[in-house]
Amino acid sequence: YTLSLHDALPIYCAAYTNVDGCEVNHDAAFKANALGPRNLAQAAEKTGARLVHVSTDYVFSGRENGGVAQDEATIPGPISAYGSTKLMGEKYVEQFCHRHFIVRTAWLYSYYGKNFVKTIVNAGKKFGKLEVVNDQCGNPTNAVDLAHEILQLCVTHEYGLYHCTGEGICSWYDFASEIIRLSGVDAAVAPCTSEEYKAKHPESADRPKWSALDNRMLRCTVGNDVRDWRDALACFFAHWDGDNGMKD
């Protein structure tokens, strides 16, 4: 039995996002990142609903960049199980639901849940010194901005593939340094290479060194830019209440 959901708009945000865990838990990653979107896409098509599917910058290899951010026309080439299963999810959505928005985002953080910003703040408090890779570059994205742009996009009925990230490009080291500065935590952040990090953490999955995204289609469709990642991060800290989430 299926309810009539014509003009409903389910948003598939669920994912197995533990990049390292995906390398050893293939079935779990496939179920969450590929089969889940497929099942929802089939249900949406059957009931006449539209569908938003949130995907990732990790569908790209990041091996050949030339310093240019990747737009929606760039051909994916994932180098991890996480990226591969997320790309499969995209393909299923394209195949089974013709009224879809696939929205790739990157380096997402929020007031709630586990994310890089909270990890760096907590690690800085605990250890006082951090090593963060400086040769992997992308776009930090505030979840508030992602939600806002998805809402703006959905009223257009311009279905297809979109990139939605914070404006500006930085390395994980740059991101971590700004997090520590804005948080006021007394900690030092030192840069390291991906190879140096891998030597200390051999179980870690490969990650793209250049996964910067260009929001070209979003700009042309919605008509506005996402906030610069530094401005969005500063706003996050201005309204963050630690374990309580967002300030009232």
What are these regions, as identified by a protein language model?
Residues 4, 8-32:
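NAD(P)H-binding glycine-rich loop region in Rossmannoid oxidoreductase-like domains
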Residues 206-248:
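C-terminal amphipathic/interface module of NAD(P)-dependent oxidoreductases
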Residues 149, 156-203, 237, 244-246:
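Mid/C-terminal beta-alpha module of Rossmann-like enzyme folds, strongest
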Residues 132-137, 162-169, 221:
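Glycine-rich Rossmann NAD(P)(H)-binding loop
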Residues 91-138, 143-145, 151:
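NAD(P)-dependent short-chain dehydrogenase/reductase
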Residues 24, 31, 35-39, 46, ...:
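Catalytic helix-loop patch of NAD(P)-dependent Rossmann-fold dehydrogenases
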Residues 10-13, 53, 163:
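Rossmann-fold scaffold of SDR-type NAD(P)-dependent oxidoreductases
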Residues 24, 32, 80, 138-141, ...:
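Residue-level signal for the nucleotide or nucleotide-sugar donor/cofactor binding architecture
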